[in-house]
Design a protein with these regions (language model features):
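Membrane-anchoring alpha-helices and their flanking helix-loop junctions
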Residues: 1-150, 159-219
Length: 219
């Protein structure tokens, strides 16, 4: 535990600094209130999630086993996420398009972003197998999870990610960033569909769970 906390804080700081540097560089300034507010919420959600997630899951997510099943979609999703943030920061900074998004919409976007972060954290806390790769974690006793948000919808993590990226564009104040954000949502939905098919074929009890919980972000 003594070693875990310093490493966790170092990783949190590295991610926060990296994302902040990306946004402020794209904006060309640090004097954009919507960016500062967004980064404050982003950093807080990230730290809260990292502190509450299961240590074994944190290790799995930090060093996932490479299965090659969906590498293309994972890469595309990460790229589109970064493009969305870059476009948004560029729009409100160097291009000065902040006025295109009303204040109440930016505030609503920030609230939606915080909600998505809470939903994502909830899913990760109740699901110790929340891995970024498609694989059955037999070495950790992989089983179907039907608690928390999984009682209401399959793939709540993907729903949270989609809300998060769409809300980020509004919270920062950019309409144009909805273009890469929309592409991100399409990629994530396809990824959720692939995961659903994979789990139906590979995880014992998942078919029965899918029959019981009809709601699915994968469609």
């Amino acid at each position: 535990m003594r070693l875990r906390i310093p490493r966790l804080l170092a990783r949190w700081a590295a991610i926060t600094v990296s994302i902040s540097a990306l946004l402020f560089f794209a904006a060309g300034t640090t004097h954009v209130s919507s960016l500062r507010s967004y980064l404050a919420v982003f950093s807080s959600l990230l730290l809260a999630t990292m502190l509450t997630v299961d240590p074994d899951l944190a290790k799995e997510r930090a060093h996932p086993e490479d299965t090659g099943v969906d590498d293309g979609l994972r890469f595309a999703a990460r790229l589109l996420f970064l493009l969305t943030l870059t476009f948004a920061a560029l729009s409100v900074g160097r291009l000065r398009h902040t006025f295109n998004v009303p204040t109440h919409a930016r505030d609503g976007g920030l609230v939606a972003f915080a909600f998505s972060g809470a939903l994502q954290a909830w899913a990760m806390v109740v699901n110790p197998f929340f891995s970024p790769t498609l694989r059955i974690q037999a070495e950790r006793g992989h089983r179907v999870i039907a608690d928390g948000p999984y009682r209401f919808i399959r793939h709540p993590g993907y729903l949270a990610m989609s809300i998060s990226v769409l809300a980020s564009t509004l919270a920062i104040g950019s309409w144009i960033a909805l273009i890469p954000a929309g592409a991100f949502v399409l990629v994530i939905r396809r990824r959720a569909q692939l995961e659903g098919e994979f789990l139906r074929n590979s995880l014992s009890g998942y078919i029965a769970y899918a029959r019981k919980v009809r709601g699915s972000y994968a469609g």
